[in-house]
Amino acid sequence: MSPTLRLTISTPASLLVNAQAIVALRAEDGSGSFGILPGHADFLTVLTPCVLRWRGTENIRRFCAVEEGVLRVSEGHSVTIACRSGMLGDSLAALEAQIETARARTLDTARNARVEQTRLHAQAVRQLLRYLRPSRGDA
């Protein structure tokens, strides 16, 4: 049994974390919050949107917000997390600020897309009305 864990967190686009010396990890799934220590039994679970917290051998806490994912523990020392997206932070306050900024940017993008969609829809309706209505000069 190894006294540390190896943590890998990846998204489809990047490798967020590849840490060799982790002594403890906390995460959340549908049943609630749980912790993983070196020597943990093999384990597979689906994560809910949560903030992963871990501590390395240097006793520094790290954080990663994930938007759902799959966590796998294998051989008692390897923890692998695959998620759709993740955001790293050295403190919860900084991570919260990053998440709020990203959420605001996402909402703004969605709002702009809805406005553009409405504009295109109105333009298409006007074009159809021009085509379907006979012009006054043709009568």
Curated annotation (Swiss-Prot):
Signal peptide feature range: none
Membrane topology reported for the UniProt record: Peripheral membrane protein
Keywords, comma-separated and alphabetical: ATP synthesis, Cell inner membrane, Cell membrane, CF(1), Hydrogen ion transport, Ion transport, Membrane, Transport
Top-level lineage group: Bacteria
MF annotations from Gene Ontology: ATP binding; proton-transporting ATP synthase activity, rotational mechanism
UniProt keyword annotation of Transport present: yes
InterPro entries: Alt_ATP_synth_F1_esu, ATP_synth_F1_dsu/esu, ATP_synth_F1_dsu/esu_N, ATPsynth_dsu/esu_N
Family, as annotated: Belongs to the ATPase epsilon chain family.
NCBIfam families from the UniProt entry: alt_F1F0_F1_eps (TIGR03166), PRK13447.1 (NF009981)
UniProt protein name: ATP synthase epsilon chain 2
Organism (species): Paraburkholderia xenovorans (strain LB400)
